[in-house]
Amino acid sequence: MSYLVAHPLRVLACLIAMACGARAEEAKEATSTADQSKVTVGATLMSDYIYRGISYSAHQPSVAAYVDAQQGWLYGYTNFNSVKFSTSPAVEVTVAAGIRPTLGPFEFDIGAAYYYYPGEQGPDLSNYWEAHATLSHKVTDKLSWGPTIAYAPDVWQSGAWGVYGAGTLAYELPSEFLPTGLTWSLSLDFGRWLFGPTSGAGGVSAAGGGLALPAFNNWHAGLKFSYQVFKLGLNYTDTSLSKENCYVLTGDLGATPGGVANPGDNPLGLRSRLCGATFSATLGFEFNPLTLGR
């Protein structure tokens, strides 16, 4: 596994130096160009990189760096995240683009993302793209909720389509008793990922051709603390996947025998621990470089 840590950490160090020079609160946009434009630069250290309930870092620390640029409704987003897959990619690169219109208390995000895993070992690759639509409804100044739907025609190049649906509820908790400038919020998520039959081995999946990848539910509860440009997250995640189906879905190289064998997709009864209940923490920052020095 080429587990990319050194280069993201260098990026992280440079971004922290920039963030520390930012103002405690971003100034209001001073020009019409700034009014229409927004750029967010950030980085995050994670005790475990969890995506839809599955550990993408094999329950090891991970680091991410990202840039999000928006002009009016249009936006583009790029994220680099260290991962640990069975195909040993150097890093996960996510490139997304779309529109984010606002209608009263409703905010929309409609776009597509491409997940790229350079440096994978073996003949099977995991790169794929996914279209998504998200709605966020701000019920009050502190309470918001919204659904998400996403579709991928070929998840991990396995030949299987994937449809993901989720709902999110977020609430900003009272902060009067906290130090000045410190806020905290609670978020709850529940999602379900459905898959079609595979046509090949796929990049990370252990499922053979013609077999459907195991569908599953996932859920998350998190607390996020924010102070100026810095953010701390405490998270609990879990899925409905059995350890045997977790192996089928992830192809985990650290899977162990002793489970229930399935002649179709898991004849050895291998068990993976990448999809179970997990507590994790994140520490990061984000800021708008367009407002530096204002």
Model-inferred region functions:
Residues 25-38, 87, 102-107, 123, ...:
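Short loop/turn motifs that connect adjacent beta-strands in outer-membrane beta-barrel proteins
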Residues 27-84, 288:
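Short glycine/proline- and aromatic-enriched beta-strand/turn motifs that initiate or cap beta-hairpins
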Residues 45-51, 71-73, 80-84, 101, ...:
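Transmembrane beta-strands of outer-membrane beta-barrel pores
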